[in-house]
Design a protein with these regions (language model features):
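Conserved adenosyl
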Residues: 134-162, 166, 174-196, 206-212
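Redox-cofactor binding/interface segments in oxidoreductases and associated redox assembly factors
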Residues: 42, 243-245, 274
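Adenosine-nucleotide cofactor-binding segment
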Residues: 185-252
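Gly/Ser/Thr-rich loops at beta-strand to alpha-helix junctions
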Residues: 47, 167-174, 198-199, 247-250
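Glycine-rich beta-strand-centered segment in the early N-terminal region that forms part
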Residues: 2-57
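NAD(P)H dinucleotide-binding glycine-rich loop of Rossmann-like/cofactor-binding domains
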Residues: 43-160
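Glycine-rich phosphate-binding loop and adjacent beta-alpha segment
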Residues: 253-290
Length: 290
């Protein structure tokens, strides 16, 4: 929050602004390549107030990195800003409801970009760099190098693993699956299990992708099914990589019980990566509404 905001909302230790992926137009700049009117895509506070950025040129051309000290503990993903070339005047973007119909296609393109670009990148980075799809690729810790935590080739190795996607129909999970199901045989897992409330749609998507490894899609209610237990046993994994994209309450616990008790794989190494959380709305004075 800005110190110029009225009290008490100018206290950054108590207040903040919810961020979101989207676009902003440059109003003032001391970087010659970024002139006023340039459109940037990135992570912004959901506010009409001006935002100050300290940007440094990056690769490829048109990409910029926020290097302010207070943002250095963020994943690099959140500090990257991209110049977006568009034929639309800024006024049309700010007042899309009254824009000429001739600009509608371009507005639609920007809308899709705002909604899906960050989600698509998140899933791609996870499939491509955290668990590299090429053996010679150096793996990167899930929170990025900024975390300072080692992530070795052994950590990223999936050759003896079953990979599990919880809340597999979520947007980030779908992005991950799209890239993951198209990796080569040499970096393939033993199997890929998707747990979702949209079994039919995901099953069709996986069938179309034709991944080079066994894949199974089940509903939350099928987690304790004997057929699933046998499927896991037949694969003979010594490692489970569980990607929790925001599963229903209790899903992760039930899965761990199946692995350790029903499938008799208590000696297996288990890696859990929490990527999302179940959305909940809490109304003060009322029960929790899901």
């Amino acid at each position: 929050v800005s110190p110029s905001y009225p009290a008490p909302y100018n206290d950054p230790s108590q207040w903040g602004i919810v961020p979101a992926w989207g676009f902003a137009s440059i109003e003032e700049s001391n970087i010659p390549e970024l002139t006023p009117g340039t459109l940037l895509h990135g992570f912004w506070p959901t506010s009409s107030a001006p935002t100050d950025l300290k940007l440094q040129a990056s690769e490829p051309s048109g990409n910029w990195v926020e290097i302010s000290e207070h943002r250095q503990q963020l994943m690099g993903f959140y500090n990257r800003y991209t110049v977006i070339k568009t034929s639309l005047p800024v006024s049309a973007i700010l007042d899309a409801q009254h824009v000429s119909s001739s600009y509608q296609d371009e507005l639609d393109r920007l809308g899709w970009l705002a909604h899906f670009q960050a989600i698509w990148r998140a899933g791609y980075f996870l499939a491509r760099y955290v668990f590299p799809s090429q053996k010679e690729q150096k793996p990167i810790y899930p929170l990025g190098d900024v975390a300072g935590v080692p992530w070795t080739k052994e950590d990223a190795d999936l050759s003896s693993a079953v990979v599990v996607s919880l809340s597999a129909a979520g947007k980030t999970a779908r992005s991950f699956a799209y890239s993951f199901e198209r990796r080569s045989k040499e970096t393939a897992p033993l199997g890929f299990l998707q747990v979702t409330s949209a079994v039919e749609g995901l099953s069709q998507a996986t069938q179309s992708a034709a991944p080079p490894f066994p894949s199974k899609t089940i509903g939350y209610g099928d987690l304790s099914d004997e057929e699933l237990v046998q499927w896991i046993k037949d694969l003979g994994p010594s490692k489970f990589v569980i990607l929790d994209f925001g599963a229903r309450d209790g899903a992760l616990k039930r899965l761990l019980e199946i692995i350790k008790v029903k499938a008799s794989l208590e000696a297996s190494k288990i890696v859990i990566i929490q990527i999302g959380s179940q959305q909940k709305v809490l109304i003060i004075g009322s029960p929790l509404i899901l």
